Amino acid sequence: MILVDMNQISVASVMMHLHMTKQTKPDEDMVRHMILNSLRMYRMRFCDEYGELVLCYDSKHYWRRDYYPEYKHNRKKGRESSANDWDAIFAVLNAVKSELKEFFPYKHLEVYGAEADDIIAALCGELEFDNGKTLILSGDKDFIQLQKYRNVTQYSPITKKFVNGVDPDDYLSEHVLKG
């Protein structure tokens, strides 16, 4: 199973497009093309070894905000100070997400209150004793801790490399201590 952190793939596609075009508002057709092409490329590269793609999305509401209202507050402040048209960006990403869900054969997971990270972590734990391999498609280093499961590997679309070389338990301990 290939667990795709779709928020990272989607936002990276938009940011690359805006950077290359020097625009602040995305071209929906180009962003759609970039996202679909990325998914096609990863499917072709990894499906024989890992199986089907499962697109994992963040919910609009995070349960962590119920307990810590400042959760990811700096991202919001960063968007407010950005020249990019974030309303247009989110409109394009939501349109592409709806199209992927309605017209494409990929499994689509979005759980109210959960982030894609939560979904991916839960699936890795559930699939630990499955005979298949699990690939996490994300550059988020927090996923290193999930490599404690014998069948989990991670590939970063950003660096275009497998993420490894760090002991998952040491990584988790270090980040707990750092806060």
Task: Name each region found by the language model.
Residues 49-50, 77-179:
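Extended two-metal-dependent nuclease catalytic cores across DNA- and RNA-processing enzymes
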Residues 1-98:
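Domain-level signal for Mg2+-assisted phosphodiester chemistry and nucleotide/NA-binding surfaces
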